[in-house]
Amino acid sequence: MDQWLETKQLPVHFVSAAGVVYQDGKVLLIRSERRGWEFPGGIVEQGEALLDGLRSEIFEESGIAAEPEAVAGIYQNLARKKGFGPLEGMTLPTTVNLVFRCRYVSGKEVVSEEFLEVGWFTPDEAMRIIRYPYMKKAFEDAHRYSGKPHFVTFRKADRDIAFISDCMI
């Protein structure tokens, strides 16, 4: 249980934040070459406040300023996976991702260097075009948010995904 005390190696997890941003009934999505359509977000930098990291990721990836309104879900990926791009050759730690429902504040869509497209879609369109299983599940949970966030545990390596548990907290 406290194995890290014996080995003197502190546990390491990535903490990330993502935002399902709504404006006039539409949802903001970005498209990457690797995962297709998804909502903006990313790893929170060490020493950075979670909500500041969320706002920053949304703006950097889309040009849109957004304000978080509620935590829609907490998603824990138990898989340690191989890095890609600049992280190739590394084994990445497990990830805990907080997904927020957000409202549009200002800005115009801008495609960043990391992504191919940015756009606004109806929720039905978003459900059709989001292909990445974890993103699809998180979007579905955020869109159907009823005041209680989902807590989902899964194991994802490459394209395979196994959902282990899903409960409302």
Tell where the protein language model's regions lie, with residue ranges:
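Acidic, metal-coordinating catalytic segment for phosphate/diphosphate chemistry
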Residues: M1-A18, D24, M90
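Nudix hydrolase/Nudix homology domain
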Residues: W37, E113-I169
